[in-house]
């Protein structure tokens, strides 16, 4: 089974002996995750904007229908 304590000691030792190599490796490992997060955030923002636009369109339509019904009654 994986010995987490030994692995953690190895990582700490590696970070102490070669900090630039360690940071480079960590940054390279995390970059795809940051990019995926940015893309998903952008897509979510676009979806929210589209939903809000659609809701405004429906609200405007309902207002126009109500206005037409009022004019029809008069």
Curated annotation (Swiss-Prot):
<keyword id="KW-0472">Membrane</keyword>
<protein>
    <recommendedName>
        <fullName>Small integral membrane protein 15</fullName>
    </recommendedName>
</protein>
<dbReference type="GO" id="GO:0016020">
    <property type="term" value="C:membrane"/>
</dbReference>
<keyword id="KW-1133">Transmembrane helix</keyword>
<feature type="coiled-coil region">
    <location>
        <begin position="42"/>
        <end position="74"/>
    </location>
</feature>
<comment type="similarity">
    <text>Belongs to the SMIM15 family.</text>
</comment>
<keyword id="KW-0812">Transmembrane</keyword>
<feature type="transmembrane region" description="Helical">
    <location>
        <begin position="20"/>
        <end position="40"/>
    </location>
</feature>
<dbReference type="Pfam" id="PF15086">
    <property type="entry name" value="UPF0542"/>
</dbReference>
<dbReference type="InterPro" id="IPR027877">
    <property type="entry name" value="Smim15"/>
</dbReference>
<feature type="compositionally biased region" description="Basic and acidic residues">
    <location>
        <begin position="55"/>
        <end position="66"/>
    </location>
</feature>
<feature type="region of interest" description="Disordered">
    <location>
        <begin position="55"/>
        <end position="74"/>
    </location>
</feature>
<keyword id="KW-0175">Coiled coil</keyword>
